Amino acid sequence: MEDIVIVGRHAVKEAIISGHAINKILIQDGIKKQQINDILKNAKSQKLIVQTVPKSKLDFLANAPHQGVAALVAPYEYANFDEFLQKQKKKARYSTVIILDGLEDPHNLGSILRTADASGVDAVIIPKRRSVALTQTVAKASTGAIQHVPVIRVTNLSKTIDELKDNGFWIAGTEANNATDYRDLQADMSLGIVIGSEGQGMSRLVSDKCDFHIKIPMVGHVNSLNASVAASLMMYEVYRKRHQLEEKS
């Protein structure tokens, strides 16, 4: 398989720190070394190959703003679902997974991974068919979070939901109608939160598998939110419920 190109100083730094298999670091000719000192220091400590290249080569490889640095990395590996379940059984806290039903926009997936990392989500689950995969665009949009959040790719989303439920998870599906306000979501349980596709929402089969449905109230003129925005609201509502503010003295 071909290398994936990661671009941008923060994303490259996170890739190095995470220990992902990096084949080569590419640095733009003429860039000031103090601007990428952390990258060079970490690359040296891991004995990575660092090559200086013309800006034109980075422009060609990245096809996006690259800040003068790129990393050629091995394709991202997906986490194993069974191994994930075993790890969750050993945890002394409730778990949270985000289940993406047919999400196709790589920028949305990258943004969801970024918020998932920030809010302590344990994994993101995507189906193999009719869904975005882990790509260079996803990596860039995640600003490094792709290195820290397990992404599980499954053949049958409906069956996976059944297995989650068998292992103590409650499944909450996001719907626009006939659903409970998401602010009433109970978080004292392990949760799987389903986010539907940008255009169609959840599939009927997946919706029927949900234990309950939640909605985000809207009082404006639009009737839906971007998938990554909706997911972010859900993730931080769970975080808020589980991490109460300490009373100020």
Swiss-Prot record:
GO terms for biological process: methylation; RNA processing. GO terms for cellular component: cytosol. The keyword Methyltransferase applies. Keywords: Methyltransferase, Transferase. The keyword rRNA-binding does not apply. InterPro entries: Alpha/beta_knot_MTases, Ribosomal_eL30-like_sf, rRNA_MeTrfase_TrmH, SpoU_MeTrfase, SpoU_subst-bd, tRNA_m1G_MTases_N. One of its GO terms (molecular function) is RNA binding. Its EC number is 2.1.1.-. SUPFAM superfamilies: alpha/beta knot, L30e-like. S-adenosyl-L-methionine binds at residues 196, 216, 225. Belongs to the class IV-like SAM-binding methyltransferase superfamily. RNA methyltransferase TrmH family. This is Putative TrmH family tRNA/rRNA methyltransferase.
